[in-house]
Amino acid sequence: MFGDEYDVYEGIEITIGDENIRCPIKYQDERTPFSPQSPYAIAKLAAHHACRLYRESYGLFTCSGILFNHESPRRGEKFVTRKITKWIGEFVRWRNRIDSQLIDVSSDENDVLKISPKELEGDGRVTDTFPKLRLGNLDAHRDWGHAKDYVRAMWMMMQHDKPDDYVVATGESHTIREFLDEAFFAMNYDGGWEDLVVIDPKFYRPSEVDYLNGVYDKIETALDWKPKYAFEDLVAEMVEEDL
């Protein structure tokens, strides 16, 4: 709820249509059919239609933001972006316990990283372990933006003289592989991340949306909004916060 009692904002997040995503059209805008893929998305879609109903039938100032994935260092740890950056921070702290020049990194049958420092004084050796990063579908495409940009869009919707519904997105789609590339680059890791990641089927979603790429032309034209944060800067900020 924003402003006076007649101003309502509802953020629908991603429920835009899977039937469109699986066809050659590789973008989604306000005209794309909705196709919610989870109970959460179904509930958000109901709220979206409620906002439209109260606006069109009762003249209330209600807006819905159709928000594509928006991230920041405050993102919950169960979401894949923050899961990756938090794991990187923990991995760096683990690795720094021993001079990285002295360790041999391998993995055992349980997909656990193992460091073996060079021979210490005497016959003793120290062994320590750290779990690999377990992820699902690395080829899923997402349109990731910075939460600061999206909150600015919400505020601008509520300041406009006419209520409406808008897609809020970046217009760029990146895979989880690309997120990993940027995240490990941001931590200055000098090896490939492929040996540090395990593909775990339990992290595959039963109703996966393969491709998301939002078109924000409408909100740019009506409100002069566009994203300020680049994908690379967003990832770097999240990694830096977790280091």
Predicted segments with their positions:
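Catalytic helix-loop patch of NAD(P)-dependent Rossmann-fold dehydrogenases
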Residues: 1-66, 71-77
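C-terminal substrate-binding subdomain of Rossmann-fold SDR/epimerase-dehydratase oxidoreductases
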Residues: 18, 23, 29, 75-243
